[in-house]
């Protein structure tokens, strides 16, 4: 049974690599601490973690412009 599970995990890994798209590893949980920052998209984010998470998932580049509200 252990061998079967190991083979299954390896197979899934090989199949995901065969598609050529790297898997994004974006943060999905940020603290609720409110330390607003302004993103290059003109939006105010609750904190730097929220901005970086949005930047990771966004198809366009989002960077930190300055600390504080936009």
Curated annotation (Swiss-Prot):
Keywords assigned by UniProt, alphabetized: Disulfide bond, Ion channel impairing toxin, Neurotoxin, Protease inhibitor, Secreted, Serine protease inhibitor, Signal, Toxin
Signal peptide (UniProt feature, chain positions): 1-20
Xref: SMART domains: KAZAL (SM00280)
Superkingdom classification of source: Eukaryota
Positions marked as site (Reactive bond): 32-33
A cellular-component GO term for this protein: extracellular region
Tissues expressing the protein: Expressed by the venom duct.
Database matches in Pfam families: Kazal_1
GO molecular function: ion channel regulator activity; serine-type endopeptidase inhibitor activity; toxin activity
InterPro entries according to UniProt: Kazal_dom (IPR002350), Kazal_dom_sf (IPR036058), Prot_inh_Kazal-m (IPR001239), Prot_Inhib_GrowthFact_Antg (IPR050653)
Main localisation: secreted
Cell location: Secreted
Residue stretches making up the Kazal-like domain: 21-70
Family from the record: Belongs to the conopeptide P-like superfamily.
Function per UniProt: Acts as a neurotoxin by inhibiting an ion channel. May also act as a serine protease inhibitor, since it possess the kazal serine protease inhibitor signature.
Protein name: Turripeptide Lol9.1
Organism (species): Iotyrris olangoensis
């Amino acid at each position: 049974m252990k061998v079967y599970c190991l083979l299954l995990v390896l197979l899934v890994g090989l199949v995901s690599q065969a598609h050529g798209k790297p898997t994004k590893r974006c943060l999905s949980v940020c603290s609720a601490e409110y330390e607003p920052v302004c993103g290059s998209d003109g939006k105010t984010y609750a904190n730097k973690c929220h901005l970086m998470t949005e930047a990771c998932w966004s198809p366009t580049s989002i960077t930190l412009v300055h600390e504080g509200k936009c």
